[in-house]
């Protein structure tokens, strides 16, 4: 996959990440972006979103607690992203349970742009039109055919698609990766997926190959999680240790420790 100094390039740029995200994990997303080396801006007012995207390095839209104002802001921001060539990451949190969120994704694809869709396996399979098991915002899916779902959805939206679970899957419609790092403790703290979406926005803001940048973001989260669990086996202390280890993560570490199968 060639030169893979994804984290180094991101930290050299210190990309400004415009986040329109949910109220549950907004603080976690801001803190993990800072620890990673990016600059977060949690700007969701619909009358500010268009202008702010024009000075941003990437736009992260998380649909977790989608209000009407956030919906309007997300659509306007995506239009600005298209006009100003700013990459967009979408996290379709809870889309199998709330069909309105699919309408919002399709509207963003129609009038704006989507570069990466990052969701759990249940959400991605649902968006791809495949049978999936979910409960609220959580996936109960066993991961069967997950890479196929990513590939189908990547072709539909002409973007990168990442599906997270016990294994993580990434596809650009032609190439793919399967990531086998991680720890179950990441499922015991609220917002691990939301934080990962923010990291995907940070890496894609400064690295051209978005399949590689997305894979690097997932490896960063998973390996930081593994290292955090070595020191902290309880959810509260683990959450703090996770951010500490994101602060210390490096390209050398993720590619040496990473268990990745390129497809």
Curated annotation (Swiss-Prot):
One of its GO terms (biological process) is thiamine diphosphate biosynthetic process. Substrate binds at residues 42, 191. It catalyses: 5-(2-hydroxyethyl)-4-methylthiazole + ATP = 4-methyl-5-(2-phosphooxyethyl)-thiazole + ADP + H(+). Its EC number is 2.7.1.50. It is an enzyme of class 2 (transferase). Belongs to the Thz kinase family. Catalyzes the phosphorylation of the hydroxyl group of 4-methyl-5-beta-hydroxyethylthiazole (THZ). This is Hydroxyethylthiazole kinase 2. It comes from Clostridium botulinum (strain Loch Maree / Type A3). The gene is thiM2.
